[in-house]
Structure formats: structure tokens, C-alpha cells
């Protein structure tokens, strides 16, 4: 058979018949560990550069390949189960020749492979079944390697020097790889093998596969990621290879989480698939920290704490699971900056942007060990605190983080407003930090109408909305803590900001708020999705909200799949760019929530429809971090963005605010109320059922049914004190 790879002049070429042409990947994650495999469950080079098993921003396994008789098995099927806990793969053999004769025909052997991740270990089980009528005697080989490169190296950052690798060893059925980094930390990959191999050749283990007709054999290995700064090699804890026990523990942990959540069903099975995958992605990205659950941002590039991403994800799913918001607030309060540090872009009261734990971060080769370079995370933190309190009525928790809220508000006024003009701005202080520090943080994301890049300090339109909403939220919280005068002051400041924002940011020619003010207070007259966030936060005027909502949900903003980050026709518009014309699901979700806030339910439903219909084309019904903003073409799918994270938590969580926006759903814990304000359901959603929706100590089961001119809300079951209000 022709080799899949051709090597010419130090370049690899893939033949047109190779399975390598399919670059779709499979992702597993648990805690601080994640894995990216090809669809066969392997880690192969050359292949997508992100393939590997990673722990705390380091790749602990860079190669994992199965071979039968020196050939890769043929892929039959591959999927990640609906709950994201298990990757299953079906493989078979290719023809095995011997002396010009095929001794094992293609399709004789079935390999069922299942993989799961738990507690910094990957468990891999292979069951090989002989469906032939003759004995099989083959060489079965598994190749491993561990390069221990930092995640930033995988992303393309080069290093002048690296640490040292240890020799590969096989002891008592455990294959060991080791590396001592320049940070003096020893990182090890220990692979426990069952059964014991017949031999080790370089980094390849060999088995003799001998099966009678109808016979089968099982092979298991556990790949453990270990960080070891002080222990000797003899004291390292080996992974316990009991696959069924690990699977049982993982299933029990998932049941504990899901039992506390609502159930959502609709009359549209495809919509249910999208919801179920989104919920599973939220479960997978939810990571237990010492401060509670935190949704890591995305796999593979952002599987860590991000302030902005965590807050927005928590806001998106707040009605569904308020525990995540509490965990996010706790974590960010504990890591709030206490002093100025230019290298970290930190000032007192500022909320964390990003935290990293790899070798390069430890050494300061990248500034992201603990980095504060975002202008919006701090007001978003206060916004989330207010929203969490409204959802839960958790006075005690809000009181515990009130000092952090006060410090965040002080940062907004003292450090966030760089020139005293009343607007929050950014201008990086770290020479290695982010140039742009809003959610659109690409270097070319903030520009004038002629395409020239804007000069800092930059005051983003949506950030003023976040500050407005933060002060409104704190103004509501303050009286509950006996600080009514402070609350009144904050309310006055919010109203003053709203009037000033209207005067400086509105552009009548564009029909939306401008993108930003530059350092000389010139307006960047560019049509961007940022204006939709001004609807979301409520800073937009009632008189202009309708014009904005209409503009965002029509061309040149709306592609048919969603709202573009930059309208078609603008100077830097490019539907294939990261921030200048692509479509981001979380961005669309906040825009839809903003449209609904001002009563524009049909516009919100149009956004919901576009993203739902796009989900039908994406692998596993999973919305990626972003996709390209090309116009929708009949009979064609959305165009993928090649390096988008998938899953990305705030993209996966987009379904929650989209559905909430259409339903007009609000939960007011202090009043024991579930409120539906002018509920609206699009034609493809004739019925929505929500069970176990918790309000305080009570819960309620609800069914919403679409009629020609109305939506009926029926209470199916009520437990405890829960009032359901429908406002039309």
C-alpha cells in the first residue's frame, strides 16, 4: 500500500487518499488536563499542531500511535459521547500480506477503543476481536513520546534554550518519560501498561497479537501527568489502571452536577442536540478550583482561567447554574490585584485577565503567569456580582466580596479613567502585554473609518456600557449593605456616564454607536458589533435602540448565520479575520439579550435562528469560538475559522442567553419569582419545557407553548414558594 506521507526536501506531503486529510480532532478535558486526539484517538506528527495530552500548559504526551503489522488501523467511526466524558473509536485492519499473499484480509479485526480523562491521567482501553475464520498472529505496536513543550511553543513562540529530557525507561510495566525544565520543575509522563509488552524498542512497545477465530484480547494503558519538584523517582505515585472504576467515578461526579441543574427539552430534536452538547461542554470546561467551580475558556489554546471569559460565561448561564457565577466571583476576588506592576499591567483593584502555569510563564518568558491586561474584566466583575445577587439573593456572599467590589469601583474611577474625562480607557504598560485590551484584542481590531489603527489610550464603546451597568448593579447592592448614600452616588454617576456616552459615541451617519474614542477623543466611526453590547448593558438610549437592533440583524452586519464583528464594507472588513468580520457566538448571544432588553424579540429570535441553524453543520453540534463571516449561501454550511477553539465555553454557553432572550426569562430570588416578559418562540420551537428550575429553596417545572399570536406558560409542577409571572 502507498505510504500516507511522502518526504521530499524536509517537507511532508500527504497523499490524496490519506485519512490525514481529515483534520477534525477529538477533545477530552478534566480539571487542569486536556487532550486533543485525531479521530482515530492517536497523536500523530505531522498532524494538527495542537494534538497531545496537556497538563498545566505543558504537553505531557506528544505522540501516541497504534500499528497492526506496521500499518495504522483503518478508521471506521469516531465520536465523543453526548456527555463529553468518553471518546469511542471503531477501527479495523488493512490487508496484511506475507510472501505475496494476504494472510489477514482487510476488515478481519475490529478494534474498539475507548478513552477518558480523569485526575491528570488518560485511560485508554483497546479490545481487539477476530471476526475471521483463521488464527491471527500479528505484531501489535504502540508508539509513545513526550516532548514537554510549553503551550506557547505549540502556538509558535520560539525559545533560545530548553531544559533536559531524561532517558526513556520501562520498569515493572510502567513506561517513563521525564523532563527537568529551566524553572527547576521536573515533569514526568508515566504510562502503566496492561498486559506487559513483550519488548520496548526506542519509544515503541510491542505485543504479539494471537487470536483464534472469534477470539478477543484487551489492552489497557493509563497515561499519568506528574509534576514533581521534590520527590525522588522511587516515591512517584503510579496511576492505578482500573478503567471501569475510573469510568464509574467520572459518571458519579457528572450525576452530582446535573442533578442540581434544570432540564431543558423542546419539540425540536435538533435544537435539543445543540442544548445537550452545550450543557456537556459547560460541564467539561467547568473546573474545580480552591475557590469553587470556574469555567476555563477554551481548548486547546485557552484551557485556563480568563477573567473576562469566565465572567461572561457565568452571566450567560446564570439562570441555568448560579454556582458557576459564585465560583468565578470568588476566584477573581481572591486574585484581584493589590499593587501596581507594569509588567503585569496591574493596578490595585483590577481584575485578573489570564493565569498560566507552564514553564515559560514560571520563568517570565511570557507575561501571563498572572496578567491583568484587560480593561473590561473589572466592571464585568461588578456586573456579575449584581446579577448573581438578583438571581440568588445570596446576601452573605455579596457582603463577603463587597470590599472587592469597592476596590473594583475605585479602579474604574482612578486607574480606568486615564485622563479624567469620565470614560474608561486602556493603554498597555507592559511592553510584552496586549496592545488592545477589550474582548477584541487583536492588534488590528481598533481602527478609524479609513482603516488606520487608532492611537491609544482607547475608550471602547462597550466598555462604557460595562461601567454603566457595573455602577447600576453596585447602586442596587449598596443599600442592602447599609450604604444607601453610596448607592445614590453610584446611580448618579451611572446616569451622568449614560448622558456623556450618548453625546460622544453616537454616530447618526452609521446608525450605531462608534467603535471607540482614541487618545485625542476622535470617534472611530466604524460599524461594529460592539454597539450591540451597549444594548446588552442598557446604556443605549430608548430612542436609538430600535435603529441599532435593526442594523445589527440586517446586512451588512447579519450574514444569515449571525452578526459579524465588523460590518461588511468597512475598511478592515475581512470575513476570515479573527475580529474584523467573523462571527462569534458569545457576541451574538449578548447582542440578542440586548435586543430583547429593549423589546425587540423578533430580532433576538433571528439571531437565535441563525446560530441554531449553523450548529447543524458543526461537528458534534458544537458552536466553535468563532467562524467566518461570509454571506450565507443556499445549501452550503458556514465556513470554519481554522484555529478556533472548540469547545470554547462562552460559545457553548451562548444557547442559554439566546433562549432566555426570546422567553423574556428573569428570576428574582428575593421575591421568589420567575418572570416571563413578552415570551416569544420562533416557528422552529413550538414548545419548550424547563424542569427543576430552582428559585431559592423551591423549584418549578414549566411548559411554554407557541400559538399563532402568543406563547402560553403552564406550571406543570411547583415545589416550595415559587411565583410565576407572565408580563405581556
Where are the regions that the model predicts?
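The core hydrophobic/aromatic register in alpha-helical repeat solenoids, strongest
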Residues: 166, 177, 385, 467, ...
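Structural motif corresponding to the C-terminal cap of alpha-helices
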Residues: 282, 286-290, 314, 336, ...
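Extended glycan-interaction surfaces of carbohydrate-active proteins
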Residues: 88-94, 103, 260-305, 330-372, ...
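Terminal accessory carbohydrate-recognition/targeting modules of carbohydrate-active enzymes
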Residues: 1-279, 283-284, 288-293, 298-304, ...
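A generic structural motif
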Residues: 129-134, 459, 474, 481, ...
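Generic structural signal for well-ordered, non-membrane alpha-helices
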Residues: 219-220, 280, 379, 383, ...
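Aromatic-rich carbohydrate-recognition surfaces in CAZymes
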Residues: 303-435, 461-464, 468, 491, ...
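Extended, well-ordered alpha-helical scaffold segments
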Residues: 234-249, 273-277, 321-335, 395-413, ...
Amino acid at each position: 500500500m502507498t505510504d500516507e506521507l511522502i518526504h521530499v526536501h524536509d517537507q511532508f506531503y500527504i497523499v490524496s487518499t490519506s485519512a490525514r486529510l481529515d483534520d477534525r480532532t477529538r477533545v477530552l478535558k478534566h480539571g487542569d488536563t486536556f487532550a486533543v486526539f485525531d479521530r482515530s484517538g492517536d497523536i500523530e506528527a505531522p498532524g494538527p499542531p495542537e494534538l497531545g495530552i496537556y497538563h498545566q500548559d505543558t504537553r505531557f504526551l506528544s505522540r501516541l500511535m497504534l500499528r497492526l503489522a506496521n500499518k495504522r488501523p483503518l478508521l471506521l467511526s469516531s465520536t465523543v459521547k453526548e456527555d463529553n466524558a468518553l471518546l469511542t473509536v471503531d477501527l479495523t485492519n488493512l490487508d496484511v500480506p506475507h510472501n505475496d499473499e494476504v494472510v489477514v484480509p482487510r476488515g478481519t479485526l475490529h478494534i474498539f477503543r475507548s478513552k477518558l480523562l480523569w485526575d491528570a491521567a488518560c485511560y485508554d482501553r483497546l479490545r481487539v476481536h477476530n471476526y475471521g475464520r483463521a488464527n491471527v498472529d500479528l505484531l501489535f505496536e504502540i508508539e509513545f513520546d513526550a516532548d514537554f513543550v510549553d503551550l506557547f511553543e505549540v502556538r509558535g513562540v520560539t525559545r533560545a534554550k530548553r531544559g533536559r529530557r531524561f532517558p526513556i525507561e520501562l520498569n515493572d510495566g510502567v513506561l517513563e518519560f521525564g523532563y527537568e525544565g529551566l524553572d527547576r520543575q521536573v515533569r514526568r509522563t508515566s504510562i502503566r501498561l496492561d498486559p506487559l509488552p513483550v519488548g520496548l524498542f526506542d519509544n515503541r512497545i510491542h505485543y504479539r497479537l494471537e487470536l483464534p477465530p472469534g477470539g478477543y484480547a484487551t489492552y489497557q494503558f493509563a497515561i499519568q501527568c506528574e509534576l514533581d519538584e521534590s520527590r525522588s523517582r522511587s516515591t512517584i505515585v503510579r496511576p492505578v489502571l482500573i478503567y471501569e472504576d475510573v469510568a464509574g467515578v467520572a459518571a458519579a461526579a457528572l450525576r452530582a452536577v446535573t442533578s442540581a441543574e434544570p432540564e431543558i427539552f423542546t419539540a425540536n430534536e435538533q435544537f435539543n442536540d445543540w442544548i445537550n452538547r452545550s450543557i456537556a461542554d459547560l460541564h467539561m470546561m467547568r473546573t474545580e478550583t480552591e475557590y469553587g467551580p470556574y469555567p476555563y475558556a477554551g481548548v486547546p489554546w485557552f484551557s485556563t482561567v480568563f477573567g473576562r471569559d469566565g465572567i461572561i460565561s457565568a452571566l450567560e448561564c446564570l439562570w441555568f447554574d448560579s454556582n458557576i457565577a459564585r465560583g468565578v466571583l470568588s476566584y477573581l476576588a481572591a486574585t484581584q490585584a493589590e499593587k501596581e506592576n507594569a509588567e503585569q499591567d496591574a493596578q490595585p483593584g483590577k481584575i485578573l485577565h489570564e493565569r498560566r502555569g507552564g514553564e515559560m510563564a514560571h520563568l517570565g518568558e511570557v507575561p501571563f503567569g498572572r496578567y491583568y491586561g484587560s480593561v473590561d474584566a473589572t466592571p464585568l466583575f461588578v456586573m456579575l456580582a449584581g446579577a448573581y445577587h438578583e438571581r440568588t439573593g445570596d446576601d452573605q456572599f455579596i457582603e463577603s466580596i463587597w470590599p472587592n467590589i469597592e476596590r473594583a469601583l475605585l479602579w474604574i474611577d482612578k486607574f480606568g479613567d486615564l485622563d479624567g474625562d469620565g470614560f474608561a480607557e486602556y493603554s498597555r504598560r507592559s511592553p510584552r502585554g496586549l496592545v488592545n485590551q477589550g474582548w477584541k484584542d487583536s492588534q488590528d481590531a481598533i481602527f478609524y473609518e479609513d482603516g488606520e489603527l487608532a492611537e491609544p489610550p482607547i475608550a471602547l464603546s462597550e466598555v462604557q456600557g460595562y461601567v454603566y451597568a457595573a455602577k447600576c448593579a453596585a447602586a442596587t447592592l449598596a443599600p442592602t449593605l447599609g450604604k444607601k448614600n453610596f448607592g445614590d452616588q453610584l446611580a448618579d454617576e451611572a446616569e451622568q456616564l449614560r448622558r456623556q456616552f450618548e453625546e460622544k459615541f453616537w454616530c447618526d451617519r452609521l446608525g450605531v454607536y462608534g467603535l471607540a474614542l482614541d487618545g485625542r477623543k476622535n470617534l472611530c466611526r466604524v460599524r461594529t458589533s460592539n454597539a450591540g453590547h451597549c444594548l446588552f448593558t442598557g446604556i443605549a438610549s430608548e430612542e436609538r435602540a430600535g435603529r441599532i437592533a435593526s442594523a445589527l440583524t440586517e446586512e451588512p452586519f447579519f450574514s444569515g448565520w449571525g452578526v459579524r464583528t465588523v460590518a461588511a464594507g468597512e475598511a478592515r472588513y475581512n470575513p476570515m479575520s479573527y475580529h474584523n468580520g467573523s462571527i462569534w457566538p458569545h457576541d451574538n448571544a449578548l447582542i440578542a439579550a440586548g435586543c430583547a432588553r429593549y423589546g425587540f424579540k423578533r430580532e433576538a429570535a433571528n439571531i437565535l435562528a441563525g446560530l441554531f441553524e449553523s450548529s447543524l453543520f458543526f461537528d458534534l453540534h458544537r458552536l466553535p469560538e468563532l467562524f467566518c463571516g461570509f454571506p450565507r449561501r443556499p445549501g452550503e454550511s458556514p465556513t470554519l475559522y481554522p484555529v478556533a477553539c472548540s469547545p470554547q465555553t462562552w460559545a457553548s454557553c451562548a444557547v442559554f442567553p439566546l433562549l432566555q432572550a426570546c422567553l423574556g426569562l428573569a428570576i428574582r430570588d428575593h421575591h421568589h419569582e420567575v418572570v416571563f416578559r413578552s415570551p416569544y418562540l420562533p416557528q422552529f420551537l413550538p414548545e419548550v419545557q424547563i424542569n427543576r428550575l430552582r428559585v431559592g429553596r423551591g423549584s418549578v417545572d414549566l411548559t411554554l407553548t407557541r400559538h399563532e399570536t402568543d406563547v402560553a406558560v403552564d406550571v406543570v409542577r411547583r415545589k416550595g414558594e415559587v411565583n410565576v409571572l407572565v408580563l405581556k
